[in-house]
């Protein structure tokens, strides 16, 4: 299949989107054109960031992703669509995919996944509430897409967020100033993580390896660690003193999750995802980094060093 040369990004200024956009621009010599499709309000609200990217060679296309004419007009000059839209507009991708399938020059599409594997467990995954919109997107692709090559980049949780000082310690937290942590599960339950910087790096690697990533759900990561291993590294990097530690057991986490959904708590999704991770829903016998020549990734020590610095 032909190499990716012209990329259009949707959702490229969001939580993970900004890392993806930055990584693609850092490898711009590998591509002919990189553009960001965004709204007029984003152009106004994120002017400084967009100006910086424009100096790095990013083209800005202003439009409304809910308007077919805007999207079709934008698609005209590109061969690859990278979607990084947020959870609140995941379902809007179905229309982006439908229009891409109908646009002959578009040959590749990366839906917004970059997180927990929504098809990890055939028995339980279909029923997890946070997965529903992404599952609808995958269902549409399986049933309706015939021409496009589709690649899902499944990264597991973002290390940067999991390792942070949460405003709700019950679902896990690491506070470097107070030297206090709340660990999930037994402390010995391994979780596969990807730093947000590596999400961008791995996405670029997939873009550069079209044959290897063609029509695959790539299971990639930066590192795997248990909460106790994470704690030990935090203690090492903060002077060697033992931290105060509490635990939220898997049973307690499940109980808190149930209560959060019943009360309409916005944090319910976080409880569900962290329960899935603690149960082992990020673990594989083999990761796919080697398929796309992306074995060099951030380590646990590097990820924690960033957190320690950010909390200083």
From Swiss-Prot:
The UniProt record lists the keyword Glycoprotein: yes
Glycosylation sites: 105
Disulfide pairings: none
Family: Belongs to the NmrA-type oxidoreductase family.
Single GO MF descriptor: oxidoreductase activity
Pathway terms, separated by semicolons: Secondary metabolite biosynthesis; terpenoid biosynthesis
Residues passing through the membrane, by range: 7-26
Function comment: Reductase; part of the gene cluster that mediates the biosynthesis of enfumafungin, a glycosylated fernene-type triterpenoid with potent antifungal activity, mediated by its interaction with beta-1,3-glucan synthase and the fungal cell wall. The pathway begins with the terpene cyclase-glycosyl transferase fusion protein that most likely uses 2,3-oxidosqualene as substrate and catalyzes glycosylation immediately after cyclization. The fernene glycoside then could be processed by the desaturase efuI which catalyzes isomerization of a double bond established by efuA to form the core structure.
Coiled-coil stretches noted in the UniProt entry, renumbered to this chain: none
GO cellular component terms, A-Z: membrane
EC number: 1.-.-.-
Alphabetically ordered keywords of this record: Glycoprotein, Membrane, NADP, Oxidoreductase, Transmembrane, Transmembrane helix
Residues that bind NADP(+): 11-17, 47, 138
Gene3D superfamilies, sorted: NAD(P)-binding Rossmann-like Domain, UDP-galactose 4-epimerase, domain 1
Protein's name according to its UniProt entry: Reductase efuL
Positions of the catalytic residues: 134 (proton acceptor)
GO biological process, one term: terpenoid biosynthetic process
């Amino acid at each position: 299949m032909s190499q990716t040369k012209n990329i259009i990004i949707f959702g490229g200024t969001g939580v993970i989107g900004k890392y993806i956009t930055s990584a693609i621009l850092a490898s711009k010599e590998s591509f002919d054109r990189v553009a960001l499709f965004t709204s007029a309000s984003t152009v106004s609200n994120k002017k400084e960031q967009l100006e910086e990217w424009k100096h790095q060679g990013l083209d800005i296309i202003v439009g409304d992703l809910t308007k077919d004419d805007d999207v079709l007009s934008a698609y005209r000059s590109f061969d690859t669509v990278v979607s990084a839209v947020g959870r609140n507009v995941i379902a809007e991708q179905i229309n982006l995919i439908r229009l891409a399938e109908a646009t002959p020059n578009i040959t590749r599409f990366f839906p917004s996944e970059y997180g927990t594997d929504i098809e990890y467990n055939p028995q339980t995954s279909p029923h997890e509430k946070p997965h529903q919109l992404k599952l609808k997107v995958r269902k549409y692709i399986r049933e309706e897409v015939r021409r496009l090559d589709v690649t899902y980049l499944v990264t597991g949780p973002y290390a940067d967020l999991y390792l942070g000082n949460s405003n709700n310690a019950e679902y896990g937290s690491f506070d470097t100033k107070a030297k206090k942590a709340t660990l999930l599960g037994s402390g010995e339950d391994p979780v596969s993580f990807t730093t947000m910087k590596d999400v961008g790096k791995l996405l670029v690697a997939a873009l550069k390896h079209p044959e290897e990533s063609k029509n695959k759900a790539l299971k990639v990561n930066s590192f795997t660690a248990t909460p106790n291993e994470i704690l030990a590294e935090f203690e090492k990097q903060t002077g060697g003193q033992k931290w105060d530690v509490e635990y939220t057991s898997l049973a307690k986490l499940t109980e808190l999750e149930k209560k959060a959904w019943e009360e309409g708590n916005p944090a319910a999704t976080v409880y569900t995802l962290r329960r899935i991770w603690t149960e082992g829903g990020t673990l594989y016998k083999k990761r796919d980094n080697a398929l796309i020549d992306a074995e060099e990734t951030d380590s646990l020590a590097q990820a924690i060093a960033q957190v320690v610095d950010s909390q200083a």
